[in-house]
Amino acid sequence: MKKVTFLFLLFAWLMCGGCTNQTDMGYVPVSGEGKIYYEEKGEGEPLILLHGHSLDTRMWDLQFDEFARHYRTIRMDFRGYGRSSKQTETFQFTHLDDLLAVMDYLKIEKAHIVGLSMGSFVAGDMVAMAPERMLSCVMASGGIRSVQGPSEPMGAEESARRDKEIAELKAKGIDVYKREWLETLISDGGSRREEMRKPLWQMIDDWDAWQPLHKEVRMFWAREAWKRLEETCPSVPTLMLRGDSKGEGKPYSPKELKYLPNGTALLLPDCGHMMNMEQPETFNRAVLQFLDGIK
């Protein structure tokens, strides 16, 4: 009887992947009665994946399971994207504030942060504004933005310019805009760029395109983050990645590294902006080797 019970328990354990292969998901309450959707898998040090503009958690499909073999891996939809709450033109928030709220809710004191494109803007904000919450930082296809931050609200001239841009976009049609945006992301790629077309379009097609059709609040610390970075020179281990789709091998020396003493930069061959989707094996290896090197 004991043997039968043991075998049953062993079978159940294997069927649930040792109880570590399950993906937990849920919502985190954030400011302004908002909520952030997240998924979590794996054990170990926390690692959080931050997606790009017009995309969502699915852009990390080729990283999520792999990283979860080594880390407690979390991916989340930013406010205004995927299954998270919508944005408004009036409520001021930053994506960094939402990220920190997710970490607090999940009882994560520090995490490895991996962001691509818009996600790298948030990762850059964090390394400057909240380095004490980071184990490491990976910024791919981007870095800290050089635009107005929350302390510089939109003025009349910028508001009028946005009115004109929004009217032009509505006249063009959002479907045309989405198709053009898709081609922009794909045309930047290397030899495997067409492999991204279907998964990229699935996300872009599902996206409600609220952002280009409205006047967004300042969601990035941006210039304020640059000022803080230059003042503090945080010691967070940092990796900055850029794709080299043309094989030109041009030097990559992002300005951020001047103020990040434990930072390094790396070119990834045969890929463009969406490097994690285009060359997932190369991207995963670069990130995991970087993380292994700082343990």
Predicted region positions:
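Active-site loop/oxyanion-hole signature of alpha/beta-hydrolase fold enzymes
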Residues: K41, D65, R75-M118, R285
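Catalytic active-site module of serine/aspartate enzymes centered on a nucleophile-bearing elbow/loop
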Residues: G263-K295
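Flexible "cap/lid" loop of the alpha/beta hydrolase fold
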Residues: A128, L135-K170
